[in-house]
Amino acid sequence: MKLDLLTAISPIDGRYRGKTDVLAAYFSEFALIKYRVQVEVEYFITLCELPLPQLKGVDKGVFETLRNIYRNFSEADAQRIKDIESVTNHDVKAVEYFLKEEFDKLGGMDDYKEFIHFGLTSQDINNTSVPLSVKEALEQVCLLYTSDAADD
């Protein structure tokens, strides 16, 4: 079935899509994947900043480049992750493999890419990504609407 008003999983994505479209940036499949990428990248950076002994050699100048992976995250990136997932049958593992590909593009990160997702479970990623999406939706959308309503 193609997605339309009659085949949407809920009225939120169906008849109310015009009113809730702004929330797609926080709660869509694309958004969840992007938040997972963000959490994995920030976790890796945190391991470098500790520093985890094996990551002492990571140049801190690469941190902004790593953050740009999620800041500039595209539909093509999300599709690449979905393609990886079709092989792995594991959504979070697909994010990890995607990030390893991105590290390969940077060069000089071969010794460090095995520390992506180091010591984490998929639930660690999901249980951080979903609340982050809720937090950002509240701050960037919901509070603005309630503030506007209070002003009226």
Question: What residue ranges belong to the model's regions?
Answer:
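A short, hydrophobic C-terminal helix/tail in secreted or cell-surface proteins
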Residues: 148-152
